[in-house]
Amino acid sequence: MSKYGDSMKIVWTNGCFDVLHRGHFEMFKYAKSFGDQLIVGIDSDEKVRNDKGPSRPHNCVEDRKFALECIKYIDEVVVFSSREGLEQEIRQLQPDVMVIGSDWKGKNVVGEEYCTELKFFDRIEGYSTTSILEKSN
């Protein structure tokens, strides 16, 4: 049984969320529309460095977590440090809906087997953390 109760519809999404931009906010709004509770998983600093390179993250995990907790669509934020940790979080939560970027269509999505429904969010043209950071350098 979920800690949110049987009647609550749980939605999960995850990512780095290093430099927040409109695309992220639109995705959180989209994700929240599918349920009562939106749980967001974020990569630890070490995982971001391993995945994106030594100059990342731009913001530390504490700051990224705090920023996400201030967003009205998000009900809880959890930190994970590995693919296995991500899978464990999703397995324990057993979300009704998982929302991920449409660039994951046709790929093996971590934790997909533990959710009831998988929804894809299309990237909003012109919004990218990488491009924001490149412009600022």
Regions found by a protein language model. Give the residues of each.
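Nucleotidyltransferase catalytic core that binds NTPs
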Residues: 1-137
